[in-house]
Design a protein with these regions (language model features):
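Hydrophobic alpha-helical connector segments
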Residues: 62, 66, 76-105, 157-161, ...
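Helix-turn-helix
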Residues: 12, 16, 24-58, 62
């Protein structure tokens, strides 16, 4: 069972292993990476790695949690700036470009987590937490600009934003505009429609 290191030496050991893992993930897939490779890159024994993490998968999860912590900081900033936006598309544009930047900055870690999901079909708790926070931001966006919220729109917009951005970064959506501004403006317009999904098809 993994637990956060408390002593300076243990913290330094963990940092060395995570840095090695992050470096190696740039060069190879998570599946083809061995504990021996990580230990060799870190210059520390395989036994020390197993004592610290227990498994290669757990080490990836620790690295991924750090990415999620950075993501939450950005999401907090988006929430704090929401009252300053004059139009919903301004905030949605910000969400789109911010998420793309975050995924690209930690591309290797996100790619490895994608591998892990495809192999194990398990959603990591931090992934679920980020998704639900994104849903909450969509609710706040609805409340700010429409005066009401609806769950269909909030969940739909969050899903579209996260899934489409990930797939674009991983080169699975070549049909989207290559131009940065155009791409994120398009995504903002799509999200605006999605936020109102609960109202589509209804009439009074």
């Amino acid at each position: 069972m993994y637990s956060e290191p408390k002593q300076d030496r243990s913290k330094a050991t963990e940092e060395a292993f995570l840095s090695a893992l992050d470096t190696l993930l740039v060069q190879t897939s998570f599946k083809n990476l061995s504990i021996e490779d990580i230990a060799r890159e870190a210059g520390i024994s395989k036994g020390a790695f197993l004592r610290r993490f227990g498994s290669k998968r757990q080490a990836l999860y620790v690295l991924y949690d750090r990415y999620c912590e950075k993501t939450v900081v950005v999401m907090d900033r988006i929430v704090s700036e929401l009252p300053l936006k004059e139009q919903a598309t301004e905030s949605l544009f910000d969400m789109s470009k911010s998420l793309e930047r975050l995924i690209k900055e930690d591309y290797s870690c996100n790619r490895a987590m994608r591998e892990d999901f495809q192999e194990n079909l398990e959603v990591h708790p931090s992934t679920r937490r980020i998704f639900l926070y994104c849903v909450e931001i969509m609710r706040r966006t609805q409340k700010r600009f429409f005066g009401v919220t609806n769950e269909t729109g909030a969940y739909s917009a969050a899903q579209i934003l996260i899934t489409n951005t990930f797939e674009y970064v991983f080169n699975a959506m070549p049909g989207l505009p290559r131009d940065y501004e155009q791409r994120h403006k398009l995504m903002a317009e799509i999200l605006l429609v999605a936020l109102q999904a609960g109202d589509i098809g209804t009439s009074k």
